[in-house]
């Protein structure tokens, strides 16, 4: 994790990227905000009831003098954001509904990002994934050419660094969806200083098994390679289909996939389903001893990321750094 953060901090030096932290009344978030404010990487915007936040700061002896605090209930920005929300959600929300929704810190924070008053958002310490992601999908939406967002995890142990996806968002994926995730994961890898070698995973290696599931991954590989070329991605390798051992162990790749572009040296792994991805990252985390950083959401027009409700202050800090780096892409 230290190596990844060092790369990102070098990239962010002097940028003071504005990141919204909607859960300012959570002590983990508020402590992380004060730590971030001491850097020149991130300039946090904290949301919540100002009196409650100041009381929490006093309890933990935190200095808030340089931190921007916004209370959605009383903010002078509320009317502007309500109007922008109604316009964005044409025909899907009345002004009265917008006023009520923007009392919610996640909707308010997402509108700050949408209107350019902030560059990214990190939430989830006290909210579900749905509470964090839903406003982003409704307001920020996905990039042109991308039909869905997806969630990757950085799996880190010592000098080893891998990306696993999709592990968090899409329960059902067709070949087109897998292809999009492969290309977006490659872009994410590049933005975090990696040279992506993307393995499309299956229970088959290069046609060793036959089934509709294998065919889907094979079709996804072709679509991903075409999309990477159309997007003019350089220094990106996407290959498959591979069993996991053939993707990561050179001696196995030599036997199972001689001549493949990836010879046991993949660093980005695209799982064939959410089930497989979620199980896979947790096995690597719990049995393999890897730190799992994420989920980092990709495919949105602006970065929004989701914390676990069991997160630590360090998790909030680290994901804020990652979100700021995404904002510079």
From Swiss-Prot:
Read off the Pfam families from this record.
PTA_PTB
Its subcellular locations are: Cytoplasm
Q: Name one GO molecular function term.
A: phosphate acetyltransferase activity
Task: Locate the coiled-coil region(s) and give their ranges.
Answer: none
Q: What is this protein called?
A: Phosphate acetyltransferase
Alphabetized SUPFAM superfamilies for the sequence = Isocitrate/Isopropylmalate dehydrogenase-like
Q: What class of enzyme is it?
A: transferase
Keywords, in A-Z order: Acyltransferase, Cytoplasm, Transferase
**Which reactions are catalysed by this chain?**
acetyl-CoA + phosphate = acetyl phosphate + CoA
EC assignment: 2.3.1.8
Q: In which pathway does it act?
A: Metabolic intermediate biosynthesis; acetyl-CoA biosynthesis; acetyl-CoA from acetate: step 2/2
